[in-house]
């Protein structure tokens, strides 16, 4: 289903006309690693051994992690950006629901500030809608980028603390469960 959904949305997600999203497979690992390491160079091992380790890690993930889909943005057939889409189940209101997450969004340095990251997020939103995800989560790399798109730091949380002496008396505690 993931592959069909991604192919269906590949050009029809609201992105730029000459851009397409495709599933990334191990045959594109060199381009993938180039974009990934140049987008996030801090704290990365850029030695030959380090790069070889990244390649091994990501090829293994591409082949074996069924919940992770590696996708790339192509402009005029050139690989310019990447991200991972995570499909998982989440307990929402006591029921397991299909959910999705966006992770490791990276744009090749030569294509930054050209709307590629925005197109990737638009694709992710379209994917979440198309797969009827109950929850879509972002792993933000820059909060200000997502703020411009209307995302916030989190939803409003109201917390109330009520002393137990103010609760009504209840003798039957058989339905109460202690959670640790």
Which sequence ranges carry the predicted segments?
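Short amphipathic alpha-helix that is part of the acyltransferase structural core
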Residues: 2-81, 85-87, 101, 168-180
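Conserved acetyl-CoA-binding loop-helix of GNAT-fold acetyltransferases
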Residues: 104-107, 113-126
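A conserved beta-turn-beta hairpin within the catalytic core of GNAT-like acetyltransferases
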Residues: 89-102, 112
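Active-site/acyl-donor-binding loops of N-acyltransferases
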Residues: 1-2, 87, 150-171
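Alpha-helical/coil-rich non-catalytic "connector" segments in signaling and regulatory proteins
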Residues: 43, 98, 115-116
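Conserved active-site alpha-helix within GNAT-family acetyltransferase domains
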Residues: 130-134, 140-159
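Short, solvent-exposed loop/edge-beta patches enriched in aromatic
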Residues: 64-65, 74-79, 107-113, 129-133
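Short glycine-biased active-site loop of nucleotidyltransferases that positions the nucleotide triphosphate
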Residues: 62-64, 93-95, 152
